[in-house]
Amino acid sequence: MSKTYRYFCRQFLNAGLLFVGSTLLASAQDADYQLDPAQTSVKFTLDDVLHSVHGTFKLKQGHLEVESDGKMSGQIVVDATSGDSGSGMRDRKMNKEVLESARYPEISFRPDRIEGPVAGSGKSSVMIHGMFNIHGADQEITVPAQVETDADHWTAAVHFTVPYQKWGMKNPSTLFLRVSDTVEIDLIAAGTVARHTAQSTQ
């Protein structure tokens, strides 16, 4: 093996180690994630025997902090009174009889840990654990999230099921129309991200 060949092998190996090291360092950084209400959507789907009802809620605010050891803090707050399924009568019934949104005007999620690294750039698949508060009660959940980040922007897609009847809310079924006792939630979050290391916070 020639000296030139060995030299190029060492250079290639060093470059690879440098790339891996910088990637691990980026993923280990603490990060603050802001949710932009204008770019974030909260959709729900409720099935009945005839069709599926689709609707939306509005995000009030959202801020998440992710530490390099996987700890999370912050919260996502949704306006429970903003539910819109395209039917005023159905929405009034949902607010009055199911969500009781006059009494419980907010739905929130307070994460406490994340499982899996979030890449400094590109796509990541993680699991997020925390407390989901709806109808005035905390429920422990773990949800999958597909996260994509670049230099200063991020998006995340989250899907999970809310067993609302099991969690103490009224099932709006009638004698002639039976609906599911669970509702599907799809959150598409987007906003800005700021990363910081120990050196940058001094």
Which residues are covered by each model-predicted region?
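Bacterial N-terminal signal peptides that target proteins for export
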Residues: 2-16
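Residues at the start of alpha-helices and the adjacent loop-to-helix junctions
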Residues: 13, 18-20, 47, 54
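N-terminal signal peptide c-region/cleavage motif recognized by signal peptidases
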Residues: 21-25
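Low-complexity, acidic/polar, glycine-enriched regions of mature
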Residues: 28-202
